[in-house]
UniProtKB/Swiss-Prot annotation:
Residue pairs linked by disulfide bridges in the UniProt entry: none
Entry-linked NCBIfam families: hisF
Name this protein carries in UniProt: Imidazole glycerol phosphate synthase subunit HisF
Cell compartment(s), UniProt: Cytoplasm
Active site (record annotation): 12, 131
Protein task: IGPS catalyzes the conversion of PRFAR and glutamine to IGP, AICAR and glutamate. The HisF subunit catalyzes the cyclization activity that produces IGP and AICAR from PRFAR using the ammonia provided by the HisH subunit.
Annotated GO biological process: L-histidine biosynthetic process
Enzyme class: lyase
Record-linked Gene3D superfamilies: Aldolase class I (3.20.20.70)
Substrates-to-products reaction catalysed: 5-[(5-phospho-1-deoxy-D-ribulos-1-ylimino)methylamino]-1-(5-phospho-beta-D-ribosyl)imidazole-4-carboxamide + L-glutamine = D-erythro-1-(imidazol-4-yl)glycerol 3-phosphate + 5-amino-1-(5-phospho-beta-D-ribosyl)imidazole-4-carboxamide + L-glutamate + H(+)
UniProtKB keywords: Amino-acid biosynthesis, Cytoplasm, Histidine biosynthesis, Lyase
Positions of transmembrane segments: none
């Protein structure tokens, strides 16, 4: 693999605060997303992903403020997702400093959103976020991997492999593949799911969900991911960005 593997911390932001506990002794306020993003920038993260998990749209301006303040001091690509429903939402996030924008539920409800955003802003701006899980019991999808919404609580009946292929055709520039089964388990990424998606799409895959130890990261790249994303292992100080990059390098992967 010639391109450098990207290591991406993910910050879940609710009403302007980072959730999913954060422990950094050197931060005055570990709940402040701007401070935390700056800390990861110092740790040489390749990108930052913000996920706005606020249920109500009334906090949209709060997120725009977070992105604007982060862009003033963090000079690596920044992806912002959560609650993005229209090309106008994308426009406002790009204007305040986001480099890429993640779409999820809104694209499932209206797949034309993908092509409308890609046509207006370019494929490279659009990250399709897919919360997928293995079907249990009676199988309704061909691949056995189903797209979910509402943080994995709601089944869609949509085949995850079919959906990523369709999204690529419509103009998605990247897939953020989050395994709802592995998420939070700290038992490693869902390698089978990554392989299944890699077989069907040419665009980059960001593997998410399940990272618990440094050894979990190289297998995700081997399975076909181009980047790895994690939250709690970084927030809790279990691993640093440097730890992950050193492990990837040890396995022969190029890192920045």
């Amino acid at each position: 693999m010639s391109l450098a593997v990207r290591v991406i911390p993910c910050l879940d932001v609710d009403a302007g605060r980072v959730v999913k506990g954060v422990h950094f002794e050197n931060l005055k306020d570990a709940g402040d997303p701007v401070e935390l993003a700056a800390e990861y920038y110092r740790q040489r993260a390749d990108e930052i992903t913000f996920l706005d998990v606020t249920a109500s749209s009334s906090h949209r301006n709060t997120m725009i403020d977070v992105v604007s303040r982060t862009a003033e001091q963090v000079f690596i690509p920044m992806t912002v997702g959560g609650g993005v429903r229209t090309p106008e939402d994308v426009d406002s996030l790009l204007r305040c400093g986001a480099d890429k924008v993640g779409v999820n539920t809104a694209a499932i409800n209206d797949p034309s959103l993908i092509s409308r955003v890609a046509d207006r802003f370019g494929n490279q701006v659009l990250v399709l976020s897919v919360d997928a899980r293995r079907e249990k019991g009676e199988q309704h999808t061909q691949s056995g991997f189903e797209v979910t919404t509402m943080g994995g609580r709601k089944s869609t009946g949509i085949d995850a492999i079919w959906w990523v292929k369709r999204a690529e055709q419509l103009g998605a520039g990247e897939i953020l593949l989050n395994s709802m089964d592995a998420d939070g388990t700290k038992e490693g990424f869902d390698l089978e799911m990554i392989r299944a998606v890699r077989k069907e799409v040419k665009i980059p895959i960001i593997a998410s969900g399940g990272a618990g130890k440094v050894e979990d990261f190289p297998p995700a790249i081997e399975a076909g991911a181009d980047a790895v994303l994690a939250a709690s292992v970084f927030h809790y100080g279990i691993l640093t960005i440097a730890d992950v990059k050193a492990e990837l390098k040890k396995h022969g992967y190029t890192v920045r």
